Amino acid sequence: MRIGIAGMQTTELAAKSIQETLSDAGFDSFYFRNNSKTTMADLVIVLGGDRGVRNYFHRALDVDTPVLGISESESNGVLAQIELKELPSYLNRIKKQDYVIEDVPRIGVKVDGKNTYPVLNDVSVFTSKSATLMEYILRVNDEEVWHDSSDGVIISTPTGSSAYSLSAGGPIIFQASNVFGIISVNSLDITRRPIIVSDNSIIEIDEISSRLHCDVVLDGIDRFKINNKLEATKFTPSARIIRMKADSTAVSALANKVKLAEELLSMPPSSKLLLKILEYEGSMTQKELASKTLLPGRTVRLAMKHLMDKGYIKRNVSMQDARQKIYEIAKLD
């Protein structure tokens, strides 16, 4: 079996370490940056946790090769189930191909008529400044569903339903469900509820307007200015993800949310924000967190200490740079 090694910001040193582990177990492996080389592999190991896997599939030219997502350390990953330190214990199963390959749905996105890359979690529309209302019309298969005024709107896959969508009041959707969720964020209409549609639907967010310009946000990573219309449809082919563990990502995500709920109510706003960013984005450095949230460095440090004291996050040494510390969500027992 030939294994490719890729990952967001993966260093050649880290890749070499994994290659040595694979070589000792009898695997032929190679490290690559150009996704066109995935055709040379029977399986691709992607580092960087869920965020690394999402980033990989945003750029992948060939998605037929199944992907095994790996986190650098402890993580409640949905796309990346296993930790780097666990990899040696799974190599025998990998050699025997004793795993399940799951077809994970993706959403194809058009912004004002132009295609973007497909998303694994969600696509959303918000104004360029938070807490600013936008108006839009939601259409499903050319039928108008609602005319809304809200902070934004999210279209989610089953995978993304346990991420930002859930925090905005959306439902948890089990992985095998052939549906997408649509969630209005803080609508002025208090009766507005999330809806579930077939993943074969054509979803349109149309006639978008606000006193500020609006942005499309893809998987919580990239933002693009939008003038009038977003179209979302099922994208083929799906992403092929290797599952080494049989636990239900939907059930485990819900259990974690319930366990956190009580203490979240009394948590400082800065801690809530940082926890949410780590939950959605995956492992990040303190500098990355400050840049992402625009919080002062001192506020970030105090909030991270609070979260570590509570056991919500862990601090680890980056495998890419031993001088650098990374933070990520800790597993809940």
Which stretches of residues belong to each language-model region?
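ATP/nucleoside-binding phosphotransfer catalytic cores, i.e., glycine-rich phosphate-binding loops
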Residues: 125, 130, 141-145, 195-272, ...
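A short, conserved structural fragment
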Residues: 308-318
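Short helix-capping/hinge SLiMs at alpha-helix to coil transitions
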Residues: 278-281
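Short acidic, hydrophobic short linear motifs in intrinsically disordered regions
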Residues: 284-292
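Catalytic core of DAGKc-family lipid kinases
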Residues: 73-151
